[in-house]
Amino acid sequence: MKIKKSRIFAAQMQNNKIFSIGILTFVALIGSNNCTMAQETDVQKPRPTFGLEYTGEVQTDFKKLKSVNLLELGAQLPLTSKLSVELGSISVLTTDEDILTNCLQNFSSIDAPNIPFALTTAGLAWQINERHHLFAGIHRIDDNYFCSDMLGLFTHSSCGAFPTITANYDIAAYPVSALGIHYGYTKDAFSLETSLYNGVGYKDFSKRDNVFRICPESDGVFLMAQGEYDKNATRAYVGGSVLYSDLHATAQKQMRPVVWAYAEQDLTERFSVLAGYSHAFNNDITCHDFYLVCGRYAYKKAEFGVFSSYTRIDEKDEWATELTCNIQFNKIFSLQPALHFANTDGKNKCVGLVRLGVKI
């Protein structure tokens, strides 16, 4: 009986403490705009967020110049504390829609034809709980996959998505998107991503080239999944994809799988390395294998990187190497010069570029 009374008394004291703290916090908020209370209010009532990112490049093969300008807009509009609308778009302006060199892999990850406006994200995002999240709508695979810090340092297109996927299939990778569903799971050091998309990506709003188009019969379906392990100084990624399609009626409809794996290791506080491999099955495709190795060294506000890869596309071998340095001046501005070397079918090529980044 004494124990029960003492528990009741303790609970009353606890309630009195909570009540007193609540009164004091309320008075402090009214009198001095208490920051802690304001943060709690923000959590309870999420606010819309908007973003703008500009990436500009000047490219040269040391014979002529070319510029590419990419503008990305994004917005997240909360409906509830866990449900929100996500929107994103790109606009591309270039002085020359042709690639400077006829490399099998494009040396620039933002190179694209002129695009006045293309919708890249439009859908509902549901944060089910701290471990599970779901998105349904228009999206791109390179927004969720191949997004490691080291791959993000380089300007080469194969660091945005491996050519065993992008060189073989017209799936939803930059600059096109597709309707689909994406699910993510995270627990401790492990995370899992899986997606199901329309088998072909689009960027316009008219007739067949419609980003809202979903037609498994003619476009096929594209399934993708990746597991990630991130603990201490090691980050490992293993994934695979399957396209069920007839490749626009040019071949019999069948499963077309691709697998990949890559790992990052921090050797010191400043120096990291990465190695990866990807293989595409089936005989009626252009790219079967892709190998890559990278190194990164961080010093103050600068990151120095070297990237080298090998692939075989259309029965031609290509070795590609990039030397780059990304300087982050502040949270808004960055500058990144890069030098690309490629040996394609025995022919050597060299391209230089300077990339300016503005993020708000």
What are the residue ranges of the model-derived segments?
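Residue-level signature of outer-membrane beta-barrel architecture
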Residues: A75-L79, W126, I138, Y185-K187, ...
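Transmembrane beta-strand segments of Gram-negative outer membrane beta-barrel proteins
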Residues: T41-D61, V85-L87, T95, H156-S157, ...
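Surface-exposed coil loops of outer-membrane beta-barrel proteins
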Residues: E97-T121, R131-D219, G357
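Transmembrane beta-barrel strands of outer-membrane/channel proteins
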Residues: F50-V58, L87-S91, A136-R140, T194-N198, ...
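Surface-exposed loop and membrane-interface regions of Gram-negative outer-membrane beta-barrel proteins
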Residues: D61-N69, T80-A122, I128
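Detector for outer-membrane/organellar transmembrane beta-barrel domains
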Residues: S81-K82, L192-S195, E228-D314
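Outer-membrane beta-barrel "beta-signal"
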Residues: N348-I360
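Outer-envelope beta-barrel architecture signal
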Residues: Q44-F50, S81-V85, E130-L134, L179, ...
